[in-house]
Design a protein with these regions (language model features):
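Conserved beta-strand elements of the Class I
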Residues: 95-99, 187, 267-271
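N-terminal phosphate/diphosphate-binding loop that engages ATP/GTP or pyrophosphate donors
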Residues: 84-146
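Phosphate-binding/switch loop-helix module in NTP-utilizing enzymes
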Residues: 138-181
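Glycine-rich phosphate-binding P-loop
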Residues: 66-85
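Inter-motif core of Ras-like GTPase G domains
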Residues: 179-192, 213
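Residue-level signal for inorganic ion chemistry
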Residues: 39, 79, 130, 172, ...
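C-terminal accessory "lid"/substrate-recognition subdomains
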Residues: 1-25, 194-292
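A transmembrane-helix-recognition feature enriched in membrane-embedded lipid enzymes
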Residues: 2-64
Length: 292
């Protein structure tokens, strides 16, 4: 079985829009957005072709670059994997830096070295969250991993090398950032059967499934409901990844930890900025709150 067929069969089983014919509003929305998805597909395919043919050339940084990304809009566990990889490599003795995009922040053009006091409006929420996760444990050497926020990852990468002597640069959400040459492309796919292979804006895919051919490593996040990929006839290694909640952090005191069992039996109000929040909701439900 090919990777494309495998993913199309497994991912499309229970996407919310799979009940289109039971939800007239969803049908109308999808139909209205489909022409824009065709246009988006043309733009994405043309851009990828230019890079594949070498007509557009990526910039090369004087360091090893690892990209961690996805082909959908959020909910794949990309950020936790960035944090894990940064901690792991740093503890192995590598000088590591994380390059975040700083979406919807003031760091689109200038490089911001994130600190605990950096306003989220300056660096972006993901960059600040990555920094705080890297610095949450006082005993971890990963407190010394710098996080740089800038839409221009080449620019922030040069600063990471010159200012911190970084040997390894981890690019958060870098799969579509083809302007930058990378040593390894890690792509996460959601394997909880929540997404259909429709491109934005009619669906949740940023690229077609065929783009996975560019990946060096594919990680299936929380693959409890997906058949094993061990027998897939593909060149890329496919790994299974699970995530679980271990602790809570008060927003006003990010360095203080609260036991995760505090959720059990409590009335919980949850909100998030994840593109596909179904996994977050299921995770909270598994912690047995009295009301969510």
């Amino acid at each position: 079985m090919s990777i494309r067929l495998f993913l199309e069969q497994s991912i499309t089983r229970s996407y919310p829009f799979s009940n289109w014919w039971k939800n007239g509003i969803s049908v109308v929305i999808c139909i209205l957005f489909t022409p824009f998805s065709w246009l988006y597909s043309l733009v994405v395919s043309s851009r990828n072709t230019l890079y594949d043919l070498g007509w557009l050339k990526p910039k090369i940084l004087p360091s090893q670059v690892i990209s961690v990304g996805n082909i959908t809009v959020g909910g794949t566990g990309k950020t936790p994997h960035v944090v894990y990889l940064a901690k792991f490599l740093h503890q192995k003795g590598f000088r590591v830096a994380v390059l975040a995009a700083g979406y919807r922040s003031k760091s689109n053009k200038q490089v911001v070295v994130v600190s605990n006091d950096t306003p989220v409006s300056v660096c972006g929420d993901e960059a600040l969250m990555i920094y705080r996760q890297l610095t949450a444990d006082q005993s971890q050497k990963s407190r010394n991993v710098p996080v740089l926020s800038c839409r221009n990852r080449y620019k922030s990468g040069l600063q990471a090398v010159s200012q911190f002597g970084s040997e390894v640069l981890i690019v958060d959400d870098g799969f579509q950032h083809r302007q930058l040459e990378r040593m390894i492309d890690i792509v996460l796919i959601k394997s909880e059967n929540q997404l259909a292979p429709k491109l934005l804006p009619a669906g949740a895919f940023r690229e077609p499934l065929s783009s996975l051919g560019r990946a060096d490593i594919i990680i299936q996040s929380s693959p409890t409901k997906l058949e094993s990929a061990d027998n897939l006839n593909i060149n890329q290694p496919v790994f299974n990844s699970y995530y679980r909640a271990t602790r809570l952090y008060p927003i006003h005191e990010p360095n203080r930890q609260i036991g995760i069992d505090e959720i059990s039996g409590a009335r919980v109000f949850a909100f998030c900025g994840i593109g596909n929040p179904s996994g977050f909701s299921k995770l909270l439900q598994s912690l047995d709150p009295a009301d969510l």
